[in-house]
Amino acid sequence: MGLFRRLLGGRGADNRSIKPQRLDYLNEALALERQGDYDAAITSYRLALRDHPREPRILQNLAIALSRTGNSEDAIRHYRLALEGDATLAGAHYGLAFLLIKRGDLDGAAEHLKAFLGNPPRGVDAQKWIGHAERALRDLEASGPSERSAGLEGA
């Protein structure tokens, strides 16, 4: 009779202990991003933020996905929110720096490149990102203050 009760919507002893489970939106978002479905990943990251509204790593990953879809302003906002929660997130400093360069905020970009290089990531690909950041910072410093201000006027 337990089977019939469950089929008909009755409450059997078996389903009293069953609790609804929430989806793991963060892992879903990461998988969608790996598949290249950035719009769906953004939706999943936003759903993950409902459960963990100020989680820096979710905010950082959302910012990465937003930047890949060309939504630079939202990406910048989410990188900044991530850094408010954890100022040591190297990836957030790195991503924010290059978005600020595109925007023309070269002084802000230099600040975030220095923060990234002050606490660089470790791992297999880390040297590639570190080298890229070092070159970008050298270029910014070589441009001097007058060129940096001119870059802001053109933005």
Predicted regions located by residue number:
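Alpha-helical segment of the N-proximal tetratricopeptide repeat
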Residues: 17-54
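TPR/TPR-like (Sel1-like) alpha-helical repeat modules
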Residues: 98-125, 131-138
